[in-house]
Structure formats: C-alpha cells, structure tokens
C-alpha cells in the first residue's frame, strides 16, 4: 500500500536526540507512513542508530551522503525518494507530537488534494524544557482555503515576521516534484528561499492549525546556535539573490499579481537591512565580510533588486539604495553605516 506520509529526516551529529525523534514516529497510532533518514557523515554514531531502526522496521529507509553543512541535501534526496502522497519534514533532533499523525491524516482526508497544509509548531526550549510558544501563521478564524498568492497577502497583512519553517507545512509530494521545489545545496536557513516559492505556485493552501511538531530550540551544537552570524551572511546572500532572480522570472508573466512585489520587497529588503546593518551586526561582523557577501547579493547589479524597491515604503527604499551604495562604493561605506545607525534608532522610536 502506498504510504500516506513520507517523513524526511536529515540526520547529522544528532545521536543524543535521534532515538527520541524516531520513537515519536514509531509510536504514532497512525501507521501508514515511510520515514526516509538522510544520514550525512557524522562525528558520532548517528548512522548506527538510523540503521538500527531500519533493520527493525522496513518503513525506515536510510540513505547517506557527505557532510554538507545543512539539511538541504537530505531534504532534496528525500523528495526524490518519497513514495508517500504527502511529505513531512522532520529534523533529527525534533519530535512529532503523540497521536498527531492520525489527526493530520483525518484533517487532510476531509480536504484532500491541496498543495500545502500549513500546521503549527510547538517550540521547546532545550535549556528549560518548557514549551515557550506555538507558531501558527494563520489565526484560528482564518478562512479554510487560500490560493498561494492569497495566503502570501493574507499572512503579510497580519504578521510582520511570519515563521518560514519548512517543518510548519505538510506538502503534497506531486506538487513539489511538478514545480521542482528543492533547497539550495549546503545552505542554512533554506526555509526562507523555499517558502515564498512554494506559496507562489500553490493552487490550494488549507491551514490545519494542528500543532503536530515539537521543535527543539537553543540546542547546543545545532546549526543555528553553533555558527557565527558572519558565516551565515554568505548563505543569506545566496538565498536572497536567488529570490531576486525568482521575482524577476515570475513577475514577467502577465498573470503575476503585482501586490506580491510589494509584499516580497518589504519582507526581503527589511530582513537584509537588519541582517547586514543593524547596530549589533555592524559591531559584530567585520565590514569586509559584509561587503564580500553583499557583492554576492548584488551580483546582477540593480537589475533584479531595483524592481523590488518600487513597492516598498519610502524609508525602506532609501535603505535599499544605501545598501547597494555600500557594496559598490568604498568611500561611502562609513557614511552608510552611520545612516543605518540613525535608521534603526528612528525605527525603534517609531515602534515604541
């Protein structure tokens, strides 16, 4: 029988957490699933644990690869291997809430065939052992179904910083394959690139409001906590440069909803401004590193970036042009940094 769910689990250096993660799958009363374990070269016995589960239960399948630095490669291979109707992305240090697969199945069966089923994630603080928040981009009273562009516009209207986590959404396998929705190899934070593209192509988005995923936050040694933010700048630059190119491609279509330019521009450019130029980042990340990575971001000059500025606020438009000047004109770098110190100070005063 074809699995209903394909659960894709990237595994690298997660031996202390992997048994709990896989047990949370095995113990689900709902049993029609396969679990694809993407094991990258690890410094611990992650692979041994993964193969132990595969030896005991044929629903677990192990594939291996070299150490890549992120979940992207394992997720991409998992999508290619998946035989289930729907895909769930689960990290090897996180768990699935008890009994939630059956609830997900029942809710999906009531509205079958959607491309994306956004759910909710419970955030567990690794240091305190307490659930600190539940992330759900859609309020309980949201309408039951959107198109992808409608969902993008709706979320932008109610959330300044929606959660882009891939784990938040159950995806129809055929939809991901049809639109070649993959992660960029080796990059951290790939959710930020995947989510807007998936929403753009989705014809049906059905929020389920099911808090099925338990996300372990602040874990020592995780990719998020163990890498200096200056190192992550290169990944952020590649991700956003890819998004700029994506916007240029799809915005040329006659059917493109021009409101998406404003939404994407506001979101992406404000994130870039904060990531490269907030006072804390200016202090902690060397100027040379910020210049180097902005050159990646603006590798096509103003061609892909400029059109996004048209729909953003006046202050953000000025900030966007300042970022470009910082990357291209060495003599303006100190003045631009001074501008951003004032920019973020005024933003803080305005929001207080």
Tell where the protein language model's regions lie, with residue ranges:
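Cell-envelope/extracellular polymer assembly enzymes that use nucleotide-activated donors
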Residues: 3-6, 34, 193
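Short, well-formed alpha-helical segments that are part of the catalytic scaffolds
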Residues: 13-27
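A conserved acidic beta->alpha catalytic loop
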Residues: 31, 39-49, 67-68
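Glycine-rich, basic loop-to-helix element that forms the pyrophosphate-binding segment
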Residues: 65-82
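Short aromatic/hydrophobic "clamp" motif used to bind/position activated sugar donors
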Residues: 87
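Donor-binding/catalytic cores of nucleotide-activated saccharide
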Residues: 92-208, 213-231
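Catalytic core of nucleotide-sugar-dependent glycosyltransferases
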Residues: 210-219, 225-254, 271-303
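Membrane-interface aromatic/basic loop that binds lipid-linked glycans or pyrophosphate carriers
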Residues: 278-352
């Amino acid at each position: 029988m074809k699995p209903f769910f394909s659960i894709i689990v990237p595994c690298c250096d997660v031996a202390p957490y992997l048994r709990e993660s896989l047990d949370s799958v095995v113990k689900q009363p709902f049993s029609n699933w396969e679990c694809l374990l993407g094991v990258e070269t690890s410094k611990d016995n992650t692979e041994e644990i993964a193969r132990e589960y595969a030896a005991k239960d044929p629903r677990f399948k192990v594939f291996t690869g070299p150490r890549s630095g992120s979940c992207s490669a394992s997720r991409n291979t998992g999508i290619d291997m998946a035989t289930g109707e729907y895909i769930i992305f689960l990290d090897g240090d996180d768990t699935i809430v008890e009994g939630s697969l059956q609830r997900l199945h029942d809710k999906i069966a009531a509205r079958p065939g959607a491309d994306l089923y956004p759910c909710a994630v419970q955030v567990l603080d690794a240091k305190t052992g307490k659930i600190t928040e539940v992330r759900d981009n859609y309020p309980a009273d949201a309408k039951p179904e959107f198109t992808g562009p409608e969902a993008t516009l709706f979320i932008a209207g109610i959330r300044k910083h929606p959660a882009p986590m891939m784990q938040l959404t159950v995806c129809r396998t055929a939809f991901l394959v049809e639109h070649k929705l993959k992660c960029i190899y080796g990059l951290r934070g790939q959710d930020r690139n995947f989510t807007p593209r998936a929403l753009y192509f989705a014809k049906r988005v059905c929020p389920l409001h099911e808090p099925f995923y338990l996300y372990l936050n602040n874990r020592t040694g995780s990719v998020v906590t163990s890498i200096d933010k200056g190192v992550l700048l290169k990944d952020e630059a590649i991700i956003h440069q890819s998004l700029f190119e994506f916007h240029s491609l799809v915005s040329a279509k006659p059917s493109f909803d021009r409101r998406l330019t404003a939404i994407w521009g506001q979101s992406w450019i404000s994130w870039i401004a904060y990531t490269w130029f907030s006072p804390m980042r200016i202090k902690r990340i060397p100027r040379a590193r910020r210049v180097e990575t902005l050159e990646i971001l603006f590798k096509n000059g103003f061609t892909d970036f400029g059109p996004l500025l048209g729909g953003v606020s006046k202050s953000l438009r000025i900030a966007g042009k300042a970022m470009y000047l910082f990357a291209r004109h060495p003599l303006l770098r100190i003045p631009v940094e001074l501008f951003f110190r004032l920019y973020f100070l005024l933003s803080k005063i305005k929001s207080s």
